[in-house]
Amino acid sequence: MDNIAGKVVVITGASSGIGEATAKRLAEKGAKLVLAARREDRLKALADEIVRLGGEAAHAVADVASAEDMRKTAGLAMERYGRIDVLVNNAGIMPVSRLSELRVEDWDRMIDVNVKGVLHGIAAVLPVMREQRSGHIVNLSSTSGYAVSPTSVVYGATKFAVRAITDGLRQEESAASGIRATLVAPGLTETELLNGLTSPEARAIAERIKGLGMSPDRIADAIVYAIGQPDDASVSEIIVRPTALAM
């Protein structure tokens, strides 16, 4: 993994779960981090911990649904480190429910965060990476981006969209500008994603599968693997599923 040391990595959704685990793994490998999320207290605590252990980290309070917030986050990376080598588009939400429940506000928010948020991240870093003629964008999808299931229709649709965006980015930029694109699709992972469920049916499903998910460290390891590959190799797609679940 010698290809990670010194790289400037922007991570969204860095205050907990996969984002936090990825930040810690990359800091151990010598990356310079810009951590973005909405919860400043969690971000600052993580950045302080990384610095205390000898790493480098800055943080920016940002909502990926805001294109301006993502531009400011990229600006912080450029001001602090002068380049952006990697973006980990990790932020996401999962207030799942059946379509018949008509939770339109949840649908809108999932589209804003899970789809527009990915695009806002790309828009913030792509000009920099094109000028550098190098870079790597890692987008977090889900196994729900491969198969639709009841209660997960809109969430799955957002993750199908992330797959399409990532593959399109790869086709447009890889050969033309040397920018790599990787899709990482986790199955059930022990994060905060299920904490905000309001649908009674979805809460019941979450309770049945509680404790069967993977540690966020497993997904962080996959992200680190993709980033650490030599520049002449591009890991296009990684799916990681928990052993305890067939779904």
Q: Where are the regions that the model predicts?
A:
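Conserved glycine-rich cofactor-binding loop
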Residues: 8, 15-16
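Conserved glycine-rich Rossmann-like NAD(P)H-binding loop of the short-chain dehydrogenase/reductase
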Residues: 31-46
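The beta1-alpha1 cofactor-binding region of Rossmann-like NAD(H)/NADP(H)-dependent oxidoreductases
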Residues: 40-41, 61-73, 104
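Substrate-binding pocket helix/loop in short-chain dehydrogenase/reductase
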Residues: 98-99, 106-111
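Active-site helix of classical SDR
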Residues: 122, 158
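Residue(s) in the substrate-gating loop at a strand-loop-helix junction
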Residues: 142
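C-terminal helical subdomain
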Residues: 179, 183-184, 203-247
